[in-house]
C-alpha cells in the first residue's frame, strides 16, 4: 500500500513520478509497493 510519498520520491525506482503520479511509469503498483 501507499507509504510516505517523500520516501518513495527520493529513494523509489519511479523517482519523481512517485511524487507526481503516485505510481511508477509502466507499472500498476503504487509507490508504496515500489522499493
From Swiss-Prot:
Q: Which Gene Ontology terms describe the biological processes this protein takes part in?
A: chitin catabolic process; defense response; polysaccharide catabolic process
Q: Which UniProt keywords apply?
A: Carbohydrate metabolism, Chitin degradation, Glycosidase, Hydrolase, Hydroxylation, Plant defense, Polysaccharide degradation
Instruction: Spell out the protein name for this chain.
Output: Endochitinase 2
* EC numbers, comma separated: 3.2.1.14
SUPFAM superfamilies found in the cross-reference section:
Lysozyme-like
Reaction(s) the record says it catalyses: Random endo-hydrolysis of N-acetyl-beta-D-glucosaminide (1->4)-beta-linkages in chitin and chitodextrins
Which terms does the record give in the GO molecular function aspect?
endochitinase activity
Q: Which family does it belong to?
A: Belongs to the glycosyl hydrolase 19 family. Chitinase class I subfamily.
Keyword Phosphoprotein assigned to the entry: answer is: no
The family database entries (Gene3D superfamilies) matched by this protein are listed as: Endochitinase, domain 2
Q: Describe its function.
A: Defense against chitin-containing fungal pathogens.
Amino acid at each position: 500500500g501507499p507509504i510516505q510519498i517523500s520516501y518513495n520520491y527520493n529513494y523509489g525506482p519511479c523517482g519523481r513520478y512517485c511524487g507526481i503520479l503516485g505510481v511508477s511509469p509502466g507499472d500498476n503498483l503504487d509507490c508504496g509497493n515500489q522499493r
